[in-house]
Regions:
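Donor nucleotide-sugar binding/catalytic pocket of nucleotide-sugar-dependent glycosyltransferases
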Residues: 118-132, 137-155
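Short acidic/histidine- and often glycine-rich active-site loop of Leloir-type glycosyltransferases
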Residues: 203-204, 261-273, 277-278
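Conserved catalytic-core segment of nucleotide-activated headgroup transferases in glycan assembly
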Residues: 151-153, 159-207, 211-219
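A charged, aromatic-enriched C-terminal amphipathic alpha-helix characteristic of glycosyltransferases
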Residues: 281, 301-330
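Membrane-proximal helix-turn-helix segments that form the acceptor-binding/catalytic region
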Residues: 48-56, 81-82, 100-120
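Nucleotide-sugar-dependent
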Residues: 231-248, 257-268
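Conserved acidic donor-binding segment of nucleotide-sugar-dependent glycosyltransferases
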Residues: 270-284, 291-298
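A short, histidine- and acid-enriched strand-loop-helix "catalytic/donor-clamping" loop
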Residues: 86-103
């Protein structure tokens, strides 16, 4: 391989830059690991490869969630000692604060890496406000890159949208499924289907809840045929999550129900009772909303929310996300030239 000048370790199909530089998508080059030992070996190899590339590269877009050992962030720490370094953008899901020790260690790593990082591209306006203070880096380096729905037109149009008598929820990270199980216990007359691996082996699943682990296309079908889609998010986090689930639900014209109190990002996409419903995150709040959606008296309002969901979600495309990310990269390049 010739020495690439523009390297992307995030799984993004970024376009060429104004200068004509074509991105080298390195995401597929780094293998996934099946155990912690493999993960450590792969991370060391990845970090070393990134440092070798950094010696001749002009632009690098790094993955903030590159693995438990964070090789991309570690590479930035060592890049401080290069005589000449590339423009670096740190992208993707960023970091949650976590417990006291975890937070202190993560903050130390970020601050050590920060001199090598020109921009942090976060996924919500709320993160953009708190990120700099949270991690001890300059606010001028932080930009919001609002996320996108992920189902393709082919996947969305692969079957008829239906309402088959169940409430759907899915996804793995940052979900409060304990709350959802309690909601199901409070509403025994409603059926719930939850597609996740995080509840595997649980013995306390209510009779009206079906737990499934399904391939991608079956996940889409379950969402397509649900009465509504609930995304119960863990509150108090320092990064946004769940966007794929509730935006994909909106593409199907589903009522998308998400808790918004102490949760970042939700209001970037959803206006409550306009194109979705934002709850306060309490047990009663979720139960009341579910019954409101099912109430025949409210079907005209429900229909309007569904229509607006399908209409407003159109702006949150993958192409828009790539354009925003590219503009962030171009901004840094222009600054470096000046």
């Amino acid at each position: 391989m010739n020495e690439p000048k523009y390297i992307v370790t995030v799984d993004l199909d970024l376009p060429p830059l104004k200068s004509g530089l074509e991105p080298y998508c390195a995401f597929a080059q780094f293998p996934s690991a099946s155990n912690l030992k493999e993960e450590f070996i792969n991370s060391v190899q990845r970090m070393w490869t990134l440092l070798k590339w950094a010696r001749h590269c002009e632009v690098m877009v790094f993955d903030s969630v590159s693995g438990p050992f964070q090789p991309d962030l570690l590479a930035c720490i060592f890049m401080r000692f290069l005589s000449k370094r590339p423009v670096v953008i740190m992208a993707d899901d960023m970091w949650n604060k976590g417990g006291t020790l975890k937070y202190a260690f993560q903050k130390m790593m970020v601050r050590l890496a920060d001199p090598s990082i020109d921009r942090y591209a976060v996924h919500s306006l709320g993160e953009e406000k708190i990120f700099a203070q949270l991690w001890g880096i300059p606010h001028k380096k932080v930009r919001a890159c609002i996320y996108n729905y992920t189902f393709t037109d082919e996947e969305v149009n692969a079957g008829a949208v239906a309402t088959n008598g169940y409430i759907f929820s899915g996804g793995n990270p940052s979900r409060n499924y304990d709350l959802l199980l309690e909601i199901a216990r409070q509403l025994p007359h409603r059926k719930f289907v939850i597609a996740t691996r995080t509840l595997r082996g649980r013995k306390d699943i209510p009779a009206n809840v079906e737990i499934v682990q399904v391939p991608h296309l079956e996940f889409i079908r379950l969402m397509r045929e649900a009465d509504m889609v609930i995304t119960p998010l863990v509150s108090g986090g320092t990064k946004s999550s769940g966007q794929q689930t509730y935006l994909n639900a909106m593409r199907f014209g589903k009522i998308s129900i998400v808790n918004g109190k102490d949760v970042l990002g939700v209001t970037d996409y959803i206006q409550s009772y306009v194109n979705g419903i934002i709850t306060d995150g309490t047990l009663k709040g979720f139960c009341d909303v579910i019954e409101w959606v099912y109430d025949p008296v409210n079907q005209e309002a429900v229909h309007k929310i569904k229509e607006l969901a399908q209409e407003t979600v159109k702006e949150f495309t993958y192409e828009r996300y790539l354009r925003t990310m590219t503009s962030i990269i171009e901004e840094v390049i222009a600054e470096s030239r000046n």
